[in-house]
Amino acid sequence: MTKELEVHTTEIPGLLILDLPVHGDNRGWFKENWQREKMLARGLPDFSPIQNNISFNAARGTTRGIHAEPWDKYVSVASGRIFGAWVDLRKGDSFGRTVTVELGPDTAVYVPRGVGNSFQTLEDNTAYTLSLIHI
C-alpha cells in the first residue's frame, strides 16, 4: 500500500517536511514531486517557481554549506539520500533554531526565505533538486 501525502510542521516556523508517495515496480519508481492542488489542501503556500536546479553529487559525503537566499525554496531528492540541515537566520524568537532530516526520493522540504539550507550526501550519485520560489 502506498503512503499518503503528509505535511509536517517543524520547530522553525514555515519550514515544512513533506512525506511524498512513491509508486514503484520492477522498472523503478514514480512520484509527484509537486502537485499544486494537493499541496495547497495540506497547508503549503501557493507559489510560482522561478527557477529549478539540480545538484548532482558523485561521491557520498559531499557537503553543500548553508545558503540563505532572499526567496523561498522547495527541495527534494531525485536519487540517493541526504542529511539535510536548516537553521533559522531571521530576527525573532525562532532565531538559531535548527532542524535536521534525512531525505530520499520520498521526502521534500519547503524552506521559507531567511532560513539557511544545507546538506551532505549519504550515498554516491545523489541528485538534489531545488526550486526557487517567488511568492
Question: Predicted regions: what is each one?
Answer:
Residues 1-103, 123-125, 132-133:
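Non-catalytic, conserved peripheral segments adjacent to functional cores
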Residues 102-123:
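Conserved metal-binding segment of the jelly-roll/cupin
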Residues 116, 128-129:
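A short beta-strand-loop-alpha-helix capping motif that often carries His-Thr
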